[in-house]
Amino acid sequence: AAAAAGFDYFEWSVQAFLQPRAEASTFAQALAAVRAAPLPCPVCNCFLPGDLKVTGPVVDDAALDAYAATACARAAEAGVDTIVFGSGGARQVPEGFNRARAEGQIAAFLRRLAPVARRHGVVIVIEPLRTGECNILNTVAECARLTRLVDDKAIRLLVDGYHWACNGEPETDIAAAAPLFRHMHVATK
């Protein structure tokens, strides 16, 4: 139905499609289903599960890096060239934890991830999430600043009309970040 309606592709979650925590045989089943679909799936969202924390006092960098490496390798195999890093549960800053330190943890993760993504032909796009879903990297301007800080072509920006409308972001911030855009979500408030 989506193909008949004129859609070009569909977007599915990393956790449901690429399944970085699952055995290769489980991923192979999902891959076969996607390959049989009438539309391709070049983009995956929901990158990190909520229990794989990127911020806070207990972050397992080795587990994050292994998960990300598997996700990127499977993305390449599946023809996925863009992975959306919204992952509000994973990046949520724990109460009382230093926000600047949390942003530094996210930047460090993205810097480690960038060469892995690049090696597999994948671009990671940071998704600004409205304040009701996450307490860090909520605006296009904040995510654009982080994208520039990481400074790697494998890390770009997603813009989502729903989140920017909910946050009441000025259109000038959206326009200023436009050179960093790789992907867009369209929804209404």
Which residues make up each language-model segment?
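Short, basic/glycine-rich phosphate-binding loops at helix/coil junctions
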Residues: 48, 84, 89-90, 123-124, ...
